[in-house]
Amino acid sequence: MEPIWAVGLMTGTVLDGNIDVALIKTDGERIAEFGPYALAPYPDWIRRLLEETLAQARVWNFNGPEPAIFKEAEEALTRAQSAAVKELVEGFGLTMADIGVVGFHGQTVLHRAPQKGRLGDTRQLGDGELMHSILGTKVAYDFRSADVRAGGQGAPLAAAYHTALLRSAGTGDDTAILNLGGVANITWSDGEGNFVAFDTGPANAPLNDFIKSHGLGEMDRDGALGRAGKVDETRLAKLLEHPYLSAAYPKSLDRFDFGASMADGLSVEDGAATLSAFTASAVGKALDLLPRRPKKLVVSGGGRHNPTIMSMLETHAGVTPIGAEMFGWRGDAVEAECFAFLAVRVLRGLPISFPGTTGVPAPMRGGRLAE
């Protein structure tokens, strides 16, 4: 198949108020060209709506009928993300007729990993049929449900794209990709077609929630609070005893599985330092689970903008962190690019989840296509 232009959309569980939207040219196996990338801010009313939706989702917890707010939020975010796609494409001098497919991840409102004797559950809000009717192009969406129904974790799905990036950079098994979003996830490849991916632990979500709870903004900007604080080593050691961290992969997390309450009772600075150290230390424990411990981590996602977390990856995880830009990648765009890449795989009928990533029995296709 010849490479086609595809748009990818991602809004993370950290709820930073932005739509990540990226355009790439790909055949679903290699990246032929990187197009533009943008952060399109949600209107404040949609951001507040999504915060309330996530709160109601936690109360619902997959029991009984879905909250009515889901339908309202789904339509609002679908229309807003459709507008973001159109603006990016037309700003690049293309029309929607030039776009082969849009990868619409939607907004994860709740994710529950499978347990012995029970399948997992996952819910992403996003109306692919509505987006198709607005944009007039094919839309791949609902990427995770089929994997979960087949007994998989439903996450992480970025491994196929991360592996393509590593292959294009010519790295070996001493380098892995770490994405620091609301949750942290890692992808490792041996360079010969075998790869592993899983969620390592929390990243930005508990830290951001902790900062917000003190009325000090949306995040620990530039890692300043964490840098000024002192890690509570006793508390950190206790947190690192959590069974998830030593459990074998495949494994996945919801953004609320590790919460801001981990820092209860600490000053803002010490809490930020301790939560940052926990993120980095959890990555270190994850590296110990891999077939070979990498020496370098290429870091994407919002967390790489936090110098405190980046330096703690070196001191607490025993690895050299490298910003994605050092490889010529766009660290804020990787997840949106990923869903453009996966959309082309959905279009081509190629697998998007694998035994080494989500734990499904065999490589499997996923996603639905509105056309």
Swiss-Prot record:
Q: Report which gene this protein is encoded by.
A: anmK
Q: What is this protein called?
A: Anhydro-N-acetylmuramic acid kinase
What function does this protein fulfil? Catalyzes the specific phosphorylation of 1,6-anhydro-N-acetylmuramic acid (anhMurNAc) with the simultaneous cleavage of the 1,6-anhydro ring, generating MurNAc-6-P. Is required for the utilization of anhMurNAc either imported from the medium or derived from its own cell wall murein, and thus plays a role in cell wall recycling.
Gene3D superfamilies (alphabetical): 3.30.420.40
GO annotation, biological process: 1,6-anhydro-N-acetyl-beta-muramic acid catabolic process; amino sugar metabolic process; peptidoglycan turnover
What keywords sit in the KW lines?
Answer: ATP-binding, Carbohydrate metabolism, Kinase, Nucleotide-binding, Transferase
NCBIfam families documented for this protein: PRK09585.1-5
- PANTHER family linked: ANHYDRO-N-ACETYLMURAMIC ACID KINASE
Q: Hey, which family's this protein in?
A: Belongs to the anhydro-N-acetylmuramic acid kinase family.
Residues that bind ATP:
G12, T13, V14, L15, D16, G17, N18, I19, D20
Write the Enzyme Commission number(s) for this entry: 2.7.1.170
Q: In which pathway does it act?
A: Amino-sugar metabolism; 1,6-anhydro-N-acetylmuramate degradation; Cell wall biogenesis; peptidoglycan recycling
InterPro entries, from UniProt? Anhydro_N_Ac-Mur_kinase (IPR005338), ATPase_NBD (IPR043129)
List residues traversing the bilayer: none
